[in-house]
Amino acid sequence: MSEPHERWRVGPLRDPEFKKVSVLIATAMIDMIGFAIIFPLLPFYAIELNASPFAIGWIMASFSVAQLASAPLWGRVSDRHGRRPAVLAGLAASGIAYLVFGYATSLWVLLLSRLVQGAGGGTTAVLHAYVGDAIRPERRAQALGWISAAPGLGVSVGLLTGSGGFIYGTAVPGMVAAGLCLLNFVFTWKWLPESRIREAGDAARPRRSIRAAFATVVRRPRETVSRLVWIYGAGMLGFSAMTSVFALYLHDRFAITADKIGPFFTYLGLLNFGMRAIVLGPAVRRLGETGAIRLGTITLVVGLVAYPLVPSLMILPLVMLLMPIGTALLFPSTTALMTKYSDPSALGTTMGVAQAFAGTSRVVAPLAATFLFQRLGAGTPFYVAAAIVAMVGLLAFQLPDRPAGPQSDESG
């Protein structure tokens, strides 16, 4: 067995690792292109089918609901049958759903297609588990940062493709998205090897249920993996709260109108991409994952508090730097530590539970933030989100500096 200092020695991604991460990056980006092609066009499809604004809201939300519900299931499937089959099944489901979406003739079919799209898109946990299987521990945070940066590019490409394709007919965007899923399926089938190495006696080993995994996080929040899940969910709540009211904040505070709001979101997207793709790796090498989580939590809280205090539009771009720095340090590092502390035989389930907590935050945060914005003022959502992140973020300062291996309670 190698000495601890050998385990933590940092070097560049080895060539086989880089190839695997490249495939995961492409998978995440192409998947998000398909999502972004469809998402902004949803209201137009629904209006053509005589949907009410309330019905449109449910159709738009159905993707996230299905995604958070399916994430633990995909993780569990990947623990039992392998990461590669789970990713391929998710891509196939998404492709079929996009095709149905393009030819939907009723609201029920449209809703069904969105639910299946969300379920197919719940395989993010599997990609994270794949990194835990295939990438050296000291390089997982950087790899996860690259993978999480890729969807930002996918959104940009997808938005342009979707609006352009709609000109040629309502079925075209759905067909394009389905074609991309097919391309992604073939690409993954050919280039992504299985990462889940089955050990002797693994088939006979009792497997931890999804219910037990959730129960551990809720009932024993002081355990390390539970702490990491809570930190991840709280960070996602803060980030989602900010993004959900960002346009309203710009309009209320600086009178930014709809035709001028695009560059602000583009700038935010570029910052997110740059921080995860470029800054995260050196930061983790210097601070370690635990240090990055602590600094990321502090930066996220400061960023949330700073938004309501911005004195002028000239200062806003500087304040906007804080959130991307915080989330870039926080999310990939938290996920990387989960892979180190979790039982390898239940890693997919653990990643799925974490994604379910994050998905719940993505659903709850916009509803709560917009309500607080309307009832208590523009600054309230930021302050409340900062307080929640700060309280849960205290758990980050109770994390050990170096993993000693999977916790015994996670292996049952």
Report the location of each language-model feature:
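A membrane-interface helix-boundary motif in multi-pass transporters
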Residues: 164-179, 371-389
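Juxtamembrane intracellular "pre-TM" segments in multi-pass secondary transporters
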Residues: 3-18, 193-230, 412
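C-terminal transmembrane helical hairpin of 12-TM major facilitator-type secondary transporters
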Residues: 290-334
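Short amphipathic helix-loop junctions that connect adjacent transmembrane helices
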Residues: 40-54, 244-260
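Conserved MFS/SLC helix-loop-helix module at the cytosolic interface between two early adjacent transmembrane helices
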Residues: 68-105
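Helix-to-loop junctions at the C-terminal end of transmembrane segments
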Residues: 70-81, 275-289
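Helix-breaking motifs and short loop linkers at transmembrane-helix boundaries and internal kinks
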Residues: 50, 82, 103-108, 310-311
